Amino acid sequence: LGGNAEMNFYVEGLRFPDKDFEGLISISLSLLEPSSQGFPETPIFTDRVVFRVAPWIMTPNTLNPVEVFVCSTSDNYQFLKGMRRLVENSGYKLKVCHEYMNRGDRWMQDEIEFGYIDSPHQRFPVVLDSPRDGELQDFPYDVLLGPDFGYVTRTAYDEEVSSLDSFGNLEVSPPVTINGKNYPLGRIIIGVAFPTATKGRNMTKVVQDFLWAQKVQEPIALFSDWLLVGHVDEFMTFVPAPDKKGFRLLLASPDAGYKLFRGLQNDGHGQAKMFDGLGAEEEITVDEILSDDKLRAENNYVQSCIDWNRDVLKRELGLDDDDIIDLPILFHVTEENRAVAYYPDMVNMIVLGKNLGIPKPFGPKVDGRCALEAEMTSLMEGLGLSCTYIDDFASYHKLLGEVHCGSNVRREPFSFKWWNLEM
């Protein structure tokens, strides 16, 4: 008949890449023409098109926030008040998950991880739901999922779900280059048992397989099983920096903590008290901390665990010592030989552009000012970052979590397009 005709084909990705699905879909097209009556049609054109399902992409602390999520509980008014002030002053939206929805589960970071998918014609956020399935488990599906907000989860059928499956144990670095290899979307970071351990807790294989299968943010496994809760966000985070590198790695450091306390003692402040104002049963002097040989031995062990991870991160992210800032944080070790923060863990912070929401450490005061806050503020001011200290002592720290554990941030996507990566 002649003339022109156009036909549109649409392909919808219904599954993310995973261990058993590479994410590639092949479609073969053939244009046939009739020949003589009674004979098969013959091809005049054929082509094959391969589609790749868009991967799920995580967003690091260096990307701009869009909105912040926290829970409201019967006992976290003080925390919520501090978070509300920080988020409003930073110019972002705060979304509060109320108690009828969270049912007393305050650990917003542990239940979900925000990411996104991207294509030449559309992009939208996708939340990854943790297999921890606490009382917050209905929140991502009932509240977040929508026409332009995706949802994905992985269920561990044949594996035991542990604390390491909570997403305080799932982070992502800013973009890095290692030995000439670019990671323009950064690298995923998870915590697992020590490589040679015969026993220990790990992130479930079904979640690890999913993360590896996305291919665009090749994961790094750190050793986090030395912690009682076992999350990487208990000893590390990233903050933006105004230089070519673009970020700094912050690490908890007992050595830096003891250096600070010894300095206070040498300057005549040995009787200054930790946890001042939190009750006589909490208070302890600098002299008492420094004379506690058991605490010192515990922190030597913790420092060796963090040093192992420091070396892994330097190697896998292409970092020098100048790219790392050590924060003065002490730990103590429980009966199970696993560590928890001795005072509110300042590395477990929320990063909102140049504003940091940091657990208030209740350190010893010198001339009316907390020495730990003064040191932290000094370290961050050099990067142009502003510190807000949030009281999470009773409502989070005492329950073995801090500010980062109790909050979550949805961020803007990368400007870099994943399909420009060599895969």
Predicted regions and their residues:
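Histidine/cysteine-enriched polar flanking segments
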Residues: 1-423
